[in-house]
């Protein structure tokens, strides 16, 4: 059993039902972001699953220098604050530097540490010192048991509000693979584990100047992860993935979410009997 973490009105871990972290890869504009959040809230309320809304204000590690990165921190946080106020949903976004920690913590319910930055001690400590919930994505280059050291850096600051996310491991060039053993190994730290089902099917840099993806495998890996006992699922979604400004090839179409979430909820209920 993992520790129960409270994010706004959402509880993750501790034997609680499966939670969902979902939203667009990047904030494209205010209207689209609010529309996506409203749609997700409606879907989750209909299925009966708790939602934490996610969206990045800056995609700092895009493949190409010309790729769309987002509106930036100030405008992005303003939009996320509006989503939070309008819908009453907890919000999550990535932080990339120590300078971003304080302003982000003023708005966000969850500070997310990107996978490429998961070993950056100063960033982890600065985030931990806010007292906020910290979601750390396991680096594609890390073994699952190495996350205990990441946990130690955060908990050494007195912050036990920790969530860990599996997002696949590098498998040769331009590919990722998911080792299902990582879920019980990471949960053995005592903290909830989330599966990032959409980044795990990403093909990093696979399109030359952008990343590819195989969204057709999202459902299969999600079902397997829930059966393996994860505490939550992370998915990037879009109304029209083909038109998305970031990570369209591995984003789930919003229209497909109700049926998928119903399946995942049913599997979770069996696992937690």
From Swiss-Prot:
It is found in: Cytoplasm. GO terms for molecular function: 3-deoxy-8-phosphooctulonate synthase activity. Keywords: Cytoplasm, Lipopolysaccharide biosynthesis, Transferase. InterPro entries: Aldolase_TIM (IPR013785), DAHP1/KDSA (IPR006218), KDO8P_synthase (IPR006269). Its EC number is 2.5.1.55. It comes from the Bacteria. GO terms for biological process: keto-3-deoxy-D-manno-octulosonic acid biosynthetic process. This is 2-dehydro-3-deoxyphosphooctonate aldolase. The gene is kdsA.
